């Protein structure tokens, strides 16, 4: 049973290697992980499937990893100084998308080294760069690897040079593998053993336990499963443990490793990665980034800090049928069990009824959450236009935080601050012109540009987050034929001339269509929405004006013409005064209706008007 040596825990830390894979979406990370699982024989050939670690349907369908996964693998190196020794490798699979930077930073904290995986046909992307810098800040050992070298379009020499410039190594040090065929993967694993340092503890072996939570998932049967990386000391089943940020104590019901299915074990020692179950039903009890220690004689000092994830983008989610409101609430509660960075609060809208205002880490996070609500819980939803968190100071000097247009204070405002982000865009050099033009129309300030190689350019801009969340990414892709890659990170706030544009139907504002936009874009937004609604709202028996207004000043207007019944159909010839009398009567009726009539906006009109299909 030599192959199964990884299943026994309390391994000597010198024989442990913790690593993660940093890669952009579609650069073959999950495929490489599949090959590594096969090589180490932890998955039977009959159980193997593609993207083995991506469990959620959305992950497999979109080809992205959302939750961090971890696997404990046995490996006996075939070369190098550790040849023939039994090494336990712990691979932590990280999400590659910008919205999940916080998840990545926690997974990196649990490792000593990282494999930087780059597609040999595409080169390094903006988000990979961002995660690479995160890994460098955490002092991880970086192993650069080019993947997909079996592709006809691969150009490993060119991209090896590009990576070498960024990482600061020699081009020949960049390993070349193919996740699909498995070529070069054993050599890569030997390199991991050789280059990545073993975990070290700053305390004695019998010191109080300290473990960092890097992920937690909700299991319907067993409650919350918390994934941890042991830093110091040991944890064993039936111990009392304490979460250091909340001070809550729990009994440790089960502790184990993932190889690649969860297996119970007798406990975990320093440097090991595994899971623990306490029977708690709420993920918010085990916060990612928190420190776990013994409840009695535990550690004094938590591991170095983690902040609470803060939402960047807000959007209202409303059920199309109001009867689904309780189901939506239950669904959001269940999702929050798995996703601690999702925030929500109840909201009512005159137009859309009851719903929730949700806070997300970014656009992909928002899309995925909505997808999961619709798919896993079978809900039909309308989501309002996304908005960000503004800081508003009125003339009396009172400060408000606004992330919902309907909370925008009336009257004069002395200052408005909007969040800004630092954007890094990597584009082929022929698209630099259109990309710069797009960034300027989105109020971007150029920060600099660098040529990564002759035909790839890195552009750096500072831009308002509010301009990016709407349709910036789609527009960027269409301007660059899909070749651009984008990354953004928070960069504080700036003052801005922002106004709230209301859409009025029949003189009454419809709160779902209100938006906070820059004064220069207000006219464009007003025209766009009035024209769109004129087409979408069915004609009534009376004329309906659709107006866009800032405060009491109307900036755009369209009229929905009235439907007229032919009241003269029953008059065969005859006197004109008879016809006139009927027409006057109809006119008076229309006038009366116009005064008391209300316009019902059909659900489809909301869905269509709030969709951002403009690129």
From Swiss-Prot:
Biological processes, Gene Ontology terms: positive regulation of translation
- Quote the CDD domains the UniProt record gives: EF4_II, EF4_III, LepA, lepA_C
- What UniProt keywords apply to this chain's record, in alphabetical order? Cell membrane, GTP-binding, Hydrolase, Membrane, Nucleotide-binding, Protein biosynthesis
Provide the residue positions that the database annotates as binding GTP. Answer: 26-31, 147-150
Lineage, top-rank taxon, reads Bacteria
Q: Name one GO cellular component term.
A: plasma membrane
Q: Where in the cell is it found?
A: Cell membrane
Q: What are its E.C. numbers?
A: 3.6.5.n1
Where would I find the tr-type G domain in this sequence? 14-200
Give one Pfam family.
Answer: LepA_C
Record bears the keyword Zinc: no
Q: Name one GO molecular function term.
A: GTP binding
Per the record, membrane topology reads:
Peripheral membrane protein
Q: Which SMART domains match?
A: EFG_C
What this protein catalyses is: GTP + H2O = GDP + phosphate + H(+)
| HAMAP family (alphabetical) | LepA (MF_00071)
Family affiliation: Belongs to the TRAFAC class translation factor GTPase superfamily. Classic translation factor GTPase family. LepA subfamily.
What is the role of this chain?
A: Required for accurate and efficient protein synthesis under certain stress conditions. May act as a fidelity factor of the translation reaction, by catalyzing a one-codon backward translocation of tRNAs on improperly translocated ribosomes. Back-translocation proceeds from a post-translocation (POST) complex to a pre-translocation (PRE) complex, thus giving elongation factor G a second chance to translocate the tRNAs correctly. Binds to ribosomes in a GTP-dependent manner.
Protein name, per record: Elongation factor 4
Q: What is the scientific name of the source organism?
A: Corynebacterium glutamicum (strain ATCC 13032 / DSM 20300 / JCM 1318 / BCRC 11384 / CCUG 27702 / LMG 3730 / NBRC 12168 / NCIMB 10025 / NRRL B-2784 / 534)
Organism taxonomic ancestry: Bacteria, Bacillati, Actinomycetota, Actinomycetes, Mycobacteriales
Q: Which gene encodes it?
A: lepA
């Amino acid at each position: 049973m030599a192959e199964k040596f990884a299943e026994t825990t309390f391994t000597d830390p010198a024989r442990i290697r913790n690593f993660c894979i940093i890669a952009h979406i579609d650069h073959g990370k999950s495929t490489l992980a599949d090959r590594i699982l096969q090589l180490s024989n932890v998955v039977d050939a009959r159980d193997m499937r593609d993207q083995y670690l991506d469990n959620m349907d959305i992950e497999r369908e979109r080809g992205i990893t959302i939750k961090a996964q971890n696997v404990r693998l046995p490996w006996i190196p075939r070369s190098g100084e550790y040849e023939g020794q039994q090494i336990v490798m712990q691979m932590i699979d990280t999400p590659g998308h910008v919205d999940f930077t916080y998840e990545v930073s926690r997974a990196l904290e649990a490792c000593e080294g990282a494999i930087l995986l780059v597609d040999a046909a595409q080169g390094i992307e903006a988000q990979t760069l961002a995660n690479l810098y995160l890994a460098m800040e955490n002092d991880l050992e970086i192993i650069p690897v080019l993947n997909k070298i079996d592709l006809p379009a691969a150009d490993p020499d060119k991209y090896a040079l590009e990576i070498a410039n960024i990482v600061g190594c020699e081009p020949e040090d960049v390993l070349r593998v193919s996740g699909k065929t498995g070529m070069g993967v054993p050599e890569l694993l030997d390199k991991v053993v050789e280059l990545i340092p073993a975990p070290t503890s700053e305390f004695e072996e019998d010191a109080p336990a300290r473990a960092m939570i890097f992920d937690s998932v909700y299991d319907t049967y067993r409650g919350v499963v918390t994934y941890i990386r042991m830093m110091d000391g040991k944890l064993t089943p039936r111990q009392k443990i304490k979460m250091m940020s909340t001070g809550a104590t729990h009994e440790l019901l089960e502790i184990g490793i993932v190889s690649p299915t969860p297996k119970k074990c007798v406990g975990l020692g320093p440097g090991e990665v595994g899971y623990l179950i306490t029977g708690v039903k709420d993920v918010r009890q085990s916060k990612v980034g928190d420190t776990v220690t013994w409840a009695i004689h535990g550690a004094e000092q938590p591991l170095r800090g983690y902040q609470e994830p803060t939402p960047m983008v807000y959007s209202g989610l409303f059920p199309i049928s109001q009867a689904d409101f309780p189901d939506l609430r239950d669904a959001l509660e269940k999702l929050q069990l798995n996703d601690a960075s999702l925030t929500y609060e109840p909201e009512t809208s005159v137009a859309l009824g009851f719903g929730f205002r949700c806070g997300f880490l970014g656009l992909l996070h928002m899309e995925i959450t909505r997808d999961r609500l619709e798919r896993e819980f079978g809900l039909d939803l309308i989501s309002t236009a996304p908005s960000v968190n503004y800081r508003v100071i009125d003339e009396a000097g009172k400060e408000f935080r606004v992330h919902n247009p309907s909370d925008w204070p009336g009257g004069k405002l002395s200052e408005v601050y909007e969040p800004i982000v630092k954007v890094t865009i990597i584009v082929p050099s022929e698209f630099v012109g259109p990309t710069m033009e797009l960034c300027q129309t989105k109020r971007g300030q150029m920060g600099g540009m660098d040529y990564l190689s002759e035909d790839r350019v890195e552009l750096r801009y500072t831009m308002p987050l509010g301009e990016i969340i709407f349709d910036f990414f789609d527009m960027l892709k269409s301007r660059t034929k899909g070749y651009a890659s984008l990354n953004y990170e928070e960069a504080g706030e700036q003052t801005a001339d922002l106004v709230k544009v209301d859409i009025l139907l029949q003189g009454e504002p419809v709160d779902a269509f209100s938006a906070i936009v820059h004064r220069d874009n207000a006219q464009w937004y007003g025209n766009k929405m009035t024209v769109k609604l004129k087409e979408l709202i069915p004609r009534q028996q009376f004329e309906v004006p659709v107006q866009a207004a800032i405060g009491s000043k109307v900036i755009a207007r369209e009229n929905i013409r009235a439907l007229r019944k032919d009241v003269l159909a029953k008059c065969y010839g005859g006197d004109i005064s008879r016809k006139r009398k009927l027409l006057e009567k109809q006119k008076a009726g229309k006038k009366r209706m116009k005064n008391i009539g209300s316009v019902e906006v059909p659900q489809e009109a909301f869905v269509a008007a709030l969709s951002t299909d403009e690129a």
